[in-house]
């Protein structure tokens, strides 16, 4: 039942997600592509986590943060992708009011967590390049755990504000969301209550997370750039810069798409463009992060080769004996 009658009001109990397209052929094509992307996302990030756990060579702060970023990527993609895949297979995809709240809150949690972890990783690179002699002290195990716990708390607070904002909205009219997940903008358009408080709270929370993390990243890389430019050795410059390239790529992709959706005026892009960009930063980027961090990282590639070599060697011994 999509509507619940309560006195003079009719409350919406479920929403209809329109998804990406109505074309049946395109739905099958997109289902196949996004399913493959999701499987690569989960397997790639899980492989990253396991490789970091089992490789003693990767037991460093940078990889500790990377393993949590991989976990956040799995959660972020999983908050919307399974429901999107179902949308491709059914004629009309519905999501309950509570389900919509959970989806919106989980996306806000993992999105906020990803922002904080990217900022923490930038700070880690700053300490490693600008204060290498104090690195072991400033990035001790206790400090690393505190930074990660703080990131999870930040993500939880962002999700709490988002969920409370959603629960303050009242829906009594149309229940069709022109999106593939419960995003805030289309929900605001459907609400028949005063949305000013919800918009203010959500904007404050998301804006604070974004501005705070961008500030940390910008300051960290400003000092990193100054330090690199002061280096006399060309080899030292190249080595220092190469350690930051992967992280800068991930930051640029993630914050670039967020800026397109939430900062640019809506008059400059259509709803369909919004959907495409949302797919990119919620589905594609979580798949790309393991590739970005591993392809240019010799330590990860070396650890992977060692473990694959051990596995192949052990299997050959079993076959031999």
UniProtKB/Swiss-Prot annotation:
PROSITE patterns: G_PROTEIN_RECEP_F1_1 (PS00237), G_PROTEIN_RECEP_F1_2 (PS50262). It is a multi-pass membrane protein. Disulfide bonds join 100-192. Residues 1-28, 79-102, 158-199, 262-274 are extracellular. GO terms for biological process: G protein-coupled receptor signaling pathway; sensory perception of smell. Glycans are attached at residue 8. InterPro entries: GPCR_Rhodpsn (IPR000276), GPCR_Rhodpsn_7TM (IPR017452), Olfact_rcpt (IPR000725). It comes from the Eukaryota. GO terms for molecular function: G protein-coupled receptor activity; olfactory receptor activity. GO terms for cellular component: membrane; plasma membrane. Pfam families: 7tm_4. It is found in: Cell membrane. Residues 50-57, 124-136, 221-240, 296-321 are cytoplasmic. The chain crosses the membrane at residues 29-49, 58-78, 103-123, 137-157, 200-220, 241-261, 275-295. Keywords: Cell membrane, Disulfide bond, G-protein coupled receptor, Glycoprotein, Membrane, Olfaction, Receptor, Sensory transduction, Transducer, Transmembrane, Transmembrane helix. The keyword Disulfide bond applies. Its main location: membrane. PANTHER family: OLFACTORY RECEPTOR (PTHR48018). Belongs to the G-protein coupled receptor 1 family. Potential odorant receptor. This is Olfactory receptor 5P60. It comes from Mus musculus (Mouse). The gene is Or5p60.
């Amino acid at each position: 039942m999509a509507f619940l009658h309560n006195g003079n009001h009719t409350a919406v109990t479920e929403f209809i997600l329109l998804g990406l397209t109505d074309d049946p052929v395109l739905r099958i094509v997109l289902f196949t592509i996004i399913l493959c992307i999701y499987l690569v996302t989960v397997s790639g990030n899980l492989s990253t986590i396991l490789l970091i756990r089992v490789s003693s060579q990767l037991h460093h702060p940078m990889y500790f943060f990377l393993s949590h970023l991989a976990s956040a990527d799995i959660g972020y993609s999983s908050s919307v992708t399974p429901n999107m895949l179902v949308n491709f297979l059914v004629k009309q995809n519905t999501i309950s009011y509570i389900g919509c709240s959970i989806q919106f809150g989980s996306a806000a949690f993992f999105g906020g967590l990803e922002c904080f972890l990217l900022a923490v990783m930038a700070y880690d690179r700053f300490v490693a390049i600008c204060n290498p002699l104090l690195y072991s002290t400033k990035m001790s195990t206790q400090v690393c755990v505190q930074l990660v716990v703080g990131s999870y708390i930040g993500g939880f607070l962002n999700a709490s504000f988002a969920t409370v904002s959603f629960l303050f909205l009242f829906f009594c009219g149309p229940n069709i969301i022109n999106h593939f997940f419960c995003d805030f903008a289309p929900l605001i358009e459907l609400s028949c209550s005063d949305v000013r408080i919800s918009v203010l709270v959500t904007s404050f929370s998301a804006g604070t997370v974004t501005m705070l993390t961008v500030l940390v990243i910008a300051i960290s890389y400003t000092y990193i750039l100054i330090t690199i430019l002061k280096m006399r050795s060309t080899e030292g410059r190249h080595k220092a810069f190469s350690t930051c390239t992967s992280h800068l790529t991930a930051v640029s992709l993630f914050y670039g798409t967020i800026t397109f959706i939430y900062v640019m005026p809506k008059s400059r892009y259509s709803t369909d463009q919004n959907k495409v960009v949302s797919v990119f930063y919620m589905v594609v980027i979580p798949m790309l992060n393991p590739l970005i961090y591993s392809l240019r990282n010799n330590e990860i590639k070396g650890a992977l080769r060692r473990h694959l070599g051990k596995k192949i060697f052990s299997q050959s011994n079993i076959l031999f004996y």
